[in-house]
């Protein structure tokens, strides 16, 4: 099957919080992009399927970019599937990332960067899936290699925190993702996800604030009888410990000048657990009760 499409995006933002606007006059910034995409899927035989495509992006601000994509799926039987993917990606900076200059009540600043360039990436993945009447499992390993990665970086100067957007020359993400859905009983379902990501440093500095480990789990119970439905969900989310570097300015008396320096932020891991119970009577009245962050 052959798929062709066109997508046009036109963003406009009117604000008094743009850079270079000391008088805080209302100004409008705009970005426009047009994308064309073409994709074809080919079923070679009952076990093999291949798809290939091309996406192009054009904007007056950043010019033309072409991005290929290819994917293959192998299904040795009805329960197993193996997938491999490659795609090239592209993202232009947003109006906020380019032009914003926002003061949050003197506590911190968000600063755009008009000199930023679009980020580009090459994405590779290999995954497997298994399913039967009650169980679905999937796992994926991936690598994402960026050039001119758009990143928000915390810096401190003028006695204030500043969140600034910038291009990183290169960044590499390696990750694993796993998903579980198990119908333990007809009325009881267990869901779970886990992700691991390793982000490269930028000249020895870890500016990315993503946690390496994250997981979610939920247990869903459903009960139904005439004119009544009960649904109870217990869910938990885990966010692992994360470390990243924040830029500061350090004054050196011997040199009588200040230099950029970094200090390490170390945020602990945490778990959030929620419980929600909903009851529906006669398909007309629904009562929901819930507790967020149960154990804290």
Regions found by a protein language model. Give the residues of each.
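Repeated loop/turn-to-beta-strand initiation elements of outer-membrane beta-barrel proteins
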Residues: 2, 47-50, 79-82, 134-137, ...
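Transmembrane beta-barrel strands of outer-membrane/channel proteins
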Residues: 4-10, 52-56, 70, 84-88, ...
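Face-selective signature of the C-terminal outer-membrane beta-barrel domain
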Residues: 1-62, 75, 130, 135-142, ...
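Conserved C-terminal beta-signal and adjacent last beta-strands/turns
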Residues: 207-296
């Amino acid at each position: 099957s052959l798929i062709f499409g066109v997508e046009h995006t036109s963003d406009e933002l009117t604000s008094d919080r743009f850079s270079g606007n000391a008088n805080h006059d209302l100004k409008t910034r705009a970005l426009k992009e047009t994308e064309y995409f073409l994709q074809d899927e080919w079923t070679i035989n009952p076990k093999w399927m291949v798809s290939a495509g091309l996406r192009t992006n054009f904007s007056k601000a950043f010019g033309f970019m072409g991005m290929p994509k290819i994917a293959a799926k192998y299904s040795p039987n009805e329960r197993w599937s193996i997938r491999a993917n490659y795609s090239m990606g592209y993202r232009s900076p947003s109006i906020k990332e380019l032009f914003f200059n926002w003061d949050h009540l003197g506590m911190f600043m968000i600063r755009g960067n008009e000199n930023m360039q679009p980020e580009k990436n090459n994405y590779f993945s290999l995954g497997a899936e298994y399913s039967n009447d009650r169980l679905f499992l999937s796992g994926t390993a991936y690598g994402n290699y960026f050039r001119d990665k758009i990143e928000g970086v915390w810096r401190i100067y003028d006695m204030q925190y500043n969140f600034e957007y910038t291009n990183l020359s290169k960044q590499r993400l390696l990750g694993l993702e796993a998903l579980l859905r198990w119908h333990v009983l007809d009325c009881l379902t267990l869901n779970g996800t886990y992700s691991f990501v390793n982000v490269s440093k930028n000249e020895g500095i870890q500016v990315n604030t993503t946690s390496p480990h994250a997981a979610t789990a939920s247990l869903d119970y459903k009960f139904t009888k005439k004119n009544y439905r009960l649904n109870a969900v217990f869910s938990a989310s885990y966010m692992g410990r994360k470390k990243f570097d924040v830029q500061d300015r350090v004054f050196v008396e011997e040199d009588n000048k200040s230099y950029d320096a970094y200090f390490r932020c170390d945020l602990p891991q945490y778990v959030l657990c929620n419980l929600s119970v909903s009851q529906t009577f006669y398909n007309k009245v629904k009562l929901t009760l819930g507790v967020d962050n149960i154990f804290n």
